[in-house]
C-alpha cells in the first residue's frame, strides 16, 4: 500500500483532447516511474500535484484492470488544471493515492446496471463500466443500460469508445443533448425526462449517477418515483474534496468526510445528511 502522504513521480504518456466545445476537457494517460504502481477500484480518486502550482483531487477514469497506466479526464477550470492543460507528453507530475471508498461491485453482481452520466460525470463512471464490460467480469452482471447526456455534441467525452461499448453483450447506449443540432441522430432532452421512457427492470437494477448536482437531484427523484430503492441509487461526491485524508475539513458533511467515507454514497445515505448539503 502506498504512503497516502507521499506523492509518487509519474510521466504523461499521452494527452487526448476530449471535447470540441468551450468545455475544455482532456484525458491524460500517465505512468508511475521507478517501478511504482497504484491499484484501485471503481469510484476511488487520486491527488495530482504540480510543483509550484498546487494539488487537486481527481477520480480515476481508466479501467482498474489495466496496470500499465492510469487515465485521468480533467476539465480546465482552476490553477492546477490550467497548469496541467499546458503540459505535453513526457512532462512529469506527482500522484498520491488511491483514496476513498468504491462502488459496491460485489453487491451489484447479478443485477442489471443503469448508468446515467452528464458531461464530465461520465469520467468517474468509466472505470465501473470498463470493469463490468470486461470479458473477465461481464457474466457477473446483467444488462447494462447507459443514458449519456451533454449540453451539445461537442461536450461528450469518450465518443470514440461509444460504438465499442455498444457492441458489448447485453449493453445499450442512449445519447442525448439539450437542444437540437444539425446532423444529430440521438435524443434531445434532459435525463430525468428520458429515464422515464426507458424500460427498466426496477426490482433488479442498480442505478449509478454522476453529473451536475441539478441533474442528480431530478434523476434520483425520478428513479425513486419509478420504484428503485434509494439504497440502490449510487453517486459520487468527488467535487467536494481537497486533501484526500480527512485533515483539511473541506469535505466534511455532518459527521462524515467525503474523502474517507465516500466519495461513493447511495441516496439513502445522502438523505440523512444535513439539509444544507
Task: Cite the ranges covered by each PLM segment.
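Ferredoxin-reductase
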Residues: 2-91, 150-152
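A generic structural signal for well-ordered coil/turn residues at beta-strand boundaries
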Residues: 8, 24-26, 42, 54, ...
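Short Fe-S-cluster ligation motifs
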Residues: 249, 254, 265-277
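Local cysteine-cluster metal-coordination motifs and their immediate loop/turn environment
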Residues: 214, 238-263
Amino acid at each position: 500500500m502506498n504512503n497516502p502522504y507521499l506523492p509518487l513521480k509519474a510521466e504523461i504518456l499521452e494527452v487526448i483532447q476530449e471535447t470540441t466545445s468551450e468545455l475544455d476537457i482532456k484525458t491524460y494517460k500517465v505512468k508511475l516511474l521507478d517501478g511504482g504502481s497504484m491499484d484501485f477500484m471503481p469510484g476511488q480518486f487520486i491527488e495530482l500535484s504540480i510543483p509550484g502550482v498546487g494539488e487537486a483531487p481527481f477520480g480515476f477514469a481508466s479501467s482498474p484492470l489495466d496496470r500499465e497506466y492510469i487515465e485521468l479526464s480533467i476539465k480546465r477550470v482552476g490553477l492546477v488544471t490550467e497548469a496541467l492543460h499546458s503540459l505535453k507528453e513526457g512532462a512529469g507530475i506527482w500522484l498520491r493515492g488511491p483514496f476513498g471508498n468504491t462502488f459496491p461491485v460485489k453487491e451489484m453482481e447479478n443485477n442489471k446496471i443503469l448508468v446515467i452520466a452528464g458531461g464530465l460525470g461520465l469520467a468517474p463512471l468509466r472505470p465501473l463500466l470498463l470493469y463490468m464490460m470486461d470479458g473477465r467480469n461481464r457474466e457477473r452482471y446483467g444488462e447494462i443500460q447507459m443514458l449519456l447526456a451533454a449540453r451539445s455534441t461537442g461536450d461528450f467525452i469518450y465518443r470514440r469508445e461509444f460504438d465499442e461499448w455498444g457492441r458489448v453483450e447485453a449493453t445499450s447506449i442512449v445519447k442525448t443533448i439539450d437542444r437540437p443540432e444539425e446532423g444529430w441522430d440521438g435524443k434531445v432532452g434532459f435525463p430525468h425526462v428520458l429515464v422515464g421512457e426507458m424500460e427498466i427492470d426496477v426490482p433488479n437494477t442498480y442505478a449509478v449517477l454522476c453529473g451536475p448536482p441539478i441533474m442528480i437531484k431530478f434523476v434520483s427523484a425520478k428513479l425513486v418515483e419509478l420504484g428503485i430503492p434509494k439504497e440502490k441509487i449510487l453517486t459520487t461526491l468527488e467535487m467536494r474534496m481537497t486533501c484526500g485524508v480527512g485533515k483539511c475539513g473541506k469535505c466534511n458533511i455532518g459527521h462524515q468526510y467525503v474523502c474517507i467515507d465516500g466519495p461513493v454514497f447511495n441516496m439513502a445515505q445522502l438523505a440523512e445528511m444535513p439539509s444544507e448539503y
